[in-house]
Amino acid sequence: MKILIMGLPGSGKTTLAQMIAPRLNAVWLNADEIRKQADDWDFTPEGRKRQSLRMWTLAEEAMEKNRTVVADFICPTKETREQFNADYVVWMDTIKECRFEDTNKMFEEPTEYNFRVTSKDAEMWAYLITQEVRDLIWLEQKRKA
């Protein structure tokens, strides 16, 4: 299962991902770390599409090894979210603007998501999301058996 935790910078994506990934024994893909490894700091629309594709590729590689993936990144547009193609989307709707004006202008609130986080209480949200995702993973495995 590929889980996307998306939202504006400063919304709590990384904090939540850090709590969820170990609870699900998942591979954690943090966009900042992936950008650092790729040495790609281009935040234009094309750079963001490239980052989304990079995150998708890494997630798919982990899933081929039967791993659950938790990816946290802005994923600011419908196009980047569709490109990443998550099985489960968490929208971090905890702030309305970030410190980066270009990101504020580009960011499109998602219309499709599985879970909407509305406050910065990572422990509570991690518990709720983990419970729901564990059930979905169990159902998915049962269907495959």
Tell what function each PLM region has.
Residues 2:
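Walker A (P-loop) ATP-phosphate-binding motif of ABC ATPase nucleotide-binding domains
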Residues 5:
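Hydrophobic anchor at the beta1->P-loop junction of P-loop NTPases
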Residues 10:
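Walker A (P-loop) phosphate-binding loop of P-loop NTPases
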Residues 13:
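Conserved lysine of the Walker
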Residues 17-61:
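Conserved substrate/cofactor phosphate-moiety recognition/catalytic segment
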Residues 24, 85-87, 112:
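Short, structured coil segments at secondary-structure junctions
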Residues 45-98:
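Glycine-rich phosphate-binding loop used to anchor ATP phosphates in small-molecule kinases
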Residues 83, 92-145:
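Small-molecule kinase domains that catalyze NTP-dependent phosphoryl transfer to phosphate-bearing small molecules
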